[in-house]
């Protein structure tokens, strides 16, 4: 019997902050399970979830607006600790009898708050001391409104010159509010405050660890599928790879992985996937060479969104054909992770805007009646990687830079041709190899090469050549929602350019993309 790793759990109500998923990841890092729900949940849903504590996230709205989001009143009647962050503090103050109004000055960025009263939330936590010995905390503010009167049964714990109620608390009810973001690294003691709330005030044990998550997932898979056969589309990406390893541990030879080589992969990637999972780990793998089929379907298509849809459609067709060849397969496994679940829920409630369509196994043939196995659906990406390491997957594979589902199909601009893909593969491999050699690969968040469908004149020896252009792209980011272009050394860029032009016959010019996100996206298509 495996331990119940969901026994102690935190509920996070999302009011729309860009940092809300980060709050959840921080709670998980503390070894405690949590879930992220939209703010408008019902009392019955909260009761059913039975949280050990509740966190109210930040958000972009103003509590002074009539129809702005509010926490369900039951949150304050459930008898569990509540922690309001930024907007979460404001709605807590307002709903419990305090007052909020728009501030004359919007506070955004670094601030230092002075602790003026003792509280379980910050006791013994400090970054510095005032001249008269009061603790100071370095925090990250991001708010326009501010609490101007706290509820009558609360006390002021900390303040700044422009924000009189930076932390408020009702110790008896274990309600706490902070007007800053403890989840971001700029709030230097933020993790200690979250740990104090989750582990000490809510009394949650650290049961959510990679080894225990694996044991739990294996037990759940076995309980769900029994002796049935399962099929998985293996791409070699982090999510499908960790899904494959978990299923292999749980059901062994009852798992069949279908690896579709679409001709849009990185250099030698197909061989590496087959060697690792087939030869090294001993998984059942069906290898489907399908380059011609994908490239035929893409012929003549220039529109990025149409290309994504074609690649997704052909993948499903090929995968379905292979699935139908297998006997007695009852289950389809997918590498869905928790942010996918959150995004789907947001889309269903009309709270998300699709910028690019996501690429996944989009459907099953109607004649196939299969159940769905999603062993990673409770996990964030960083947790998936930690589990992969625990399962024996190599670090370099798990911490590789992100690669889009449609692969080179969206890194070749315009029409996708085999010639373009082959040139791009080799140029990209040189860029990545040089990044690793210069110890720069792990210093950038994502790096890749883009094929531009334009010819440029060049000189090679005594002759002129009229060949293709590629662009190098490297960015630095924490969350991929915003990104800065990486300031790579000029001599490094020169070395990469020389190698590509000299070693890849067909490329005459290399450029470097210096666009940030926004306004540009990280990928070109």
UniProtKB/Swiss-Prot annotation:
Catalytically driven reaction(s): XMP + L-glutamine + ATP + H2O = GMP + L-glutamate + AMP + diphosphate + 2 H(+)
Record key words, sorted: ATP-binding, Glutamine amidotransferase, GMP biosynthesis, Ligase, Nucleotide-binding, Purine biosynthesis
Keyword flag Nucleotide-binding: yes
CDD domains (UniProt xref): GATase1_GMP_Synthase, GMP_synthase_C
Top-level EC class as recorded in UniProt: ligase
SUPFAM superfamilies: Adenine nucleotide alpha hydrolases-like, Class I glutamine amidotransferase-like, GMP synthetase C-terminal dimerisation domain
Record-linked PROSITE patterns: GATASE_TYPE_1, GMPS_ATP_PPASE
Domain GMPS ATP-PPase, chain residue ranges per copy: 208-400
EC number(s) per entry: 6.3.5.2
Any one of the GO CC terms: cytosol
UniProt-annotated catalytic positions: 86, 181, 183
Functional pathway: Purine metabolism; GMP biosynthesis; GMP from XMP (L-Gln route): step 1/1
Binding site for ATP: 235-241
Example of a GO MF term: GMP synthase activity
InterPro entries the UniProt entry points to: Class_I_gatase-like, GATASE, GMP_synth_C, GMP_synth_GATase, GMP_synthase, GMPS_ATP_PPase_dom, NAD/GMP_synthase, Rossmann-like_a/b/a_fold
Family matches, as Pfam families: GATase, GMP_synt_C, NAD_synthase
Residues in Glutamine amidotransferase type-1 domain copies: 9-207
Protein task: Catalyzes the synthesis of GMP from XMP.
Subunit structure, interactors included: Homodimer.
Protein name per the record: GMP synthase [glutamine-hydrolyzing]
Annotated source species: Escherichia coli O1:K1 / APEC
Protein encoded by which gene: guaA
